[in-house]
Amino acid sequence: MTIAETTRISVENYYRDYGARKGSLRNDLLRNPEVLFQVLAAEVSIVSALRSIQADPARAKVLDIGCGEGASLFPLLRLGFEPSNLHGVDIRGEQIALAQARYPGLHFQCIDASSLKFPDATFDIVQESMIFLQMTDQQLGKQVAQQMIRVTKPSGHLLLSDWRYGKPGTSEFKPMNQVRIASLFNVGSQTSIRKVLPGALVPPVGRFLSKNLPSMYFAASSLLPFLVGQQVTVLQKNR
């Protein structure tokens, strides 16, 4: 069994166990008030990242790594990106089937992100959302990062939306902090960091504020930046 296959099984088991432990309403945007501002903050960070690179919705070709049901590509549709230029890959076949049903105008493939089939320099933007946190194997993480760089056009951008903190008391998460990003993406040689944008707060704090003190959510993010757990790191591929 390959490392990628082991990771796929681990991710599937995690989400199944997570759903069993937390319940179906845990991340329900409509019915769980804990979720709203966490989602809003994450989306603000993505939109801010796209603005910072002056992304062109009419022309930009985008690849989403670990796309799941396609949720990370949906905001791009709202921003006017061309559906035919939006691509997503995921190793979980059932997630790809859902994405294809929900967004029939987009391109989805069930493939391993450590061995992408796209030619070199295909995409203007390559993004990921929360996949490296669960990718604890350093070799696999390096392979995926190198594939992301390979398929990005020279001077194109990589948007890394991930959690900079792990979960205390468990080894199933590996924080995507700046040290790890520099190691995986060869910052300084293959890529350069252009921006780091704050997103959602660490879940216990963010969920509490979203439900009980929503007016304080973004104030807490600004005044207490160490409480920001999710960030978007904008990398530019060197020529």
Question: How would you label these PLM feature ranges?
Answer:
Residues L63, E69-S115:
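Class I SAM-dependent methyltransferase SAM/SAH-binding core
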Residues Q127:
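A conserved beta-strand element that flanks and buttresses the S-adenosyl-L-methionine
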Residues M130-Q134:
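Short catalytic micro-motifs in class I SAM-dependent methyltransferases
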Residues K142-P154:
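A short glycine-rich, Lys/Arg-flanked "PGG" loop and its adjoining helix->strand segment in the class I
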Residues G156-D162:
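Conserved beta-strand signature within the Rossmann-like core of class I S-adenosyl-L-methionine
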Residues K174-S189:
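Short alpha-helix
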Residues K195-R239:
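A C-terminal cap/extension of S-adenosyl-L-methionine-dependent methyltransferases
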